[in-house]
């Protein structure tokens, strides 16, 4: 399908609209002018016919001359006087061009008629004349040639005006459309440059049109988001590759040990197998968490949501954690009010354990963790507090980014891969919640989850 240029479409549409509008306007004006002019011609003919009638009432017929009749006639008029027996008595005109013979029985036509003769239209008015010494009638013949010429001139003027207005409109439309489409052409060229050279170029358009400037700003914002998404994707691949490379290198190294000495040394074989299994489990966990970050949406969650009793779930998880980590102190301050939320039960358990696991990893000295729930303004609030190393303020905006670690030198020894908080944040957001953090170095961290 052949596409037309926006500028050409604009010129064609505006020109056609202007031409049709002016043409219709001129037709309406001409219609009213024709009616006005025609009525004026009829009034002139009626006036002359009435003057002729008055002339016959003012003096005897024998005293009426052709000069008297001509004095009562206007331009382009002819008068014929008949007696009661249809005998022609007078015929005179002020204009030699008016010479028309009605050519039919005058007695039977209406008072006012139109008749075309040799290409010219005439008004014919029949007026009865009855005086003391005369009885008959007059035929006033009024030529409409001048009227027709004026109407033709009006049509020509209207057409010329329409053509001139159309040309002017087309010229203005061309200039205006060029000014409008010029930024769009620049926008298209910039897009091509960005596609060729990358995200480093941004649109720099300063026009007099708010819409074009808004379009350019929106495009720049969109490109910034795409660039950010691209960088995140690239960083994600790099981080994932790095996270997978380390355990794979460890496994490869121990397999080489087994190949060299493990066949003969059971201790080396046992140690290498245990480490390889541990690193393999780390890889499996990393892959599972990566999959968790890339699946699920709001519709799926809402369709499988169940009522989760927050306090009951926390008590159950804390009981298990006390058995698993007997060296840690778990304190709870749970509200007496019933806290319920609609979500997948395993997701609540998952996000709760992520925060508890995070607290355990970074509170190896005091080993004291507190969980608190409360209801405020219909908001269900869960607070998890540890007394560990804390999070620097400059890192707090990034801790939910994938693979981000506050202390990169300690994270691997603590078993973290920087995905847990990202997963927790995603679960909270998909269920309509939010999360806040409050932390001080060497004093601890509090995560506040709000539903």
Curated annotation (Swiss-Prot):
It is found in: Cell membrane. One of its GO terms (cellular component) is plasma membrane. Pfam families: ArlS_N, HATPase_c, HisKA. GO terms for biological process: phosphorelay signal transduction system. Residues 239-451 form the Histidine kinase domain. InterPro entries: ArlS_N, Bact_Sensor_His_Kinase, HAMP_dom, HATPase_C_sf, His_kinase_dom, HisK_dim/P_dom, HisK_dim/P_sf, Sig_transdc_His_kin-like_C. The chain crosses the membrane at residues 11-31, 156-176. Autophosphorylated. It is a multi-pass membrane protein. Its EC number is 2.7.13.3. Residues 178-231 form the HAMP domain. The keyword Kinase applies. It catalyses: ATP + protein L-histidine = ADP + protein N-phospho-L-histidine. Induction: Activated by agr, SarA, SarV and MgrA. GO terms for molecular function: ATP binding; histidine phosphotransfer kinase activity; phosphorelay sensor kinase activity; serine-type peptidase activity. The modification Phosphohistidine is found at residue 242. Keywords: ATP-binding, Cell membrane, Kinase, Membrane, Nucleotide-binding, Phosphoprotein, Transferase, Transmembrane, Transmembrane helix, Two-component regulatory system, Virulence. Member of the two-component regulatory system ArlS/ArlR involved in the regulation of adhesion, autolysis, multidrug resistance and virulence. ArlS probably functions as a sensor protein kinase which is autophosphorylated at a histidine residue and transfers its phosphate group to ArlR. This is Signal transduction histidine-protein kinase ArlS. It comes from Staphylococcus aureus (strain NCTC 8325 / PS 47).
